[in-house]
């Protein structure tokens, strides 16, 4: 059975060595194959967890392709797998408290992209808004709800 570290390693190879633009994943769906297939024999996973694995792989892919995160920055558990209960970006943030808080009014794009809840589009909005002056409130750049609360854990308005 593949571990996430192997999948991430191969994905990085596809991007770096073969210049792939995109990698796609598909969760194995039990009951569609012969009983000798390893996926059919794995009884411990529920359909929800199987699809969450796929979702986490897409999150890692996006972090690598769009955020410029390196494969070494993807945090895996002791057995070489992704944590299914938390977002990979948030796990990185929890393991690197020295990086936070990020100063919204001073940080570069790369640092802004390390803040859980901020993506490339929001980072661009922040950088463009700063041209006209200091951002006073995160709500002023369109953040609200759960995303706003998440950003507030890792960023300050200095």
Segments predicted by a language model, with ranges:
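Long, highly charged, low-complexity intrinsically disordered interaction regions
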Residues: 36-114, 143-158
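Conserved strand-turn element in the central/C-terminal portion of the radical SAM core barrel
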Residues: 1-7, 26-30, 40-51
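Residue-level signature of tetratricopeptide-repeat
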Residues: 129-130
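Short alpha-helical segments in extracytoplasmic peptidoglycan/chitin-binding modules
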Residues: 112, 125-126
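Hydrophobic faces of well-ordered beta-strands that scaffold small-molecule active sites
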Residues: 23-25, 60
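Short, basic-rich loop-to-helix N-cap that marks the start of a DNA-contacting helix
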Residues: 133-138
């Amino acid at each position: 059975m593949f571990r996430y570290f192997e999948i991430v390693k191969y994905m990085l190879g596809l991007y770096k060595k073969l210049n792939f633009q995109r990698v796609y994943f598909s969760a194995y769906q039990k009951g569609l194959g012969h009983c000798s297939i390893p996926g059919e024999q794995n009884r411990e996973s529920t359909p929800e967890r199987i699809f969450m694995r796929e979702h986490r792989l897409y999150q890692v892919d996006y972090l690598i392709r769009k955020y410029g995160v390196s494969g070494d920055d993807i945090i895996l558990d002791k057995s070489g797998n992704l944590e299914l209960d938390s977002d990979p970006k948030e796990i990185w943030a929890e393991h690197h408290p020295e990086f936070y808080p990020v100063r919204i009014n001073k940080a570069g794009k790369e640092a802004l992209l390390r803040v859980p809840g901020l993506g490339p589009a929001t980072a661009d909005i922040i950088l463009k808004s700063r041209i006209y002056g200091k951002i006073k409130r995160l709500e002023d750049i369109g953040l609200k709800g759960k995303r706003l609360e998440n950003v507030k854990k890792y960023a300050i308005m200095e």
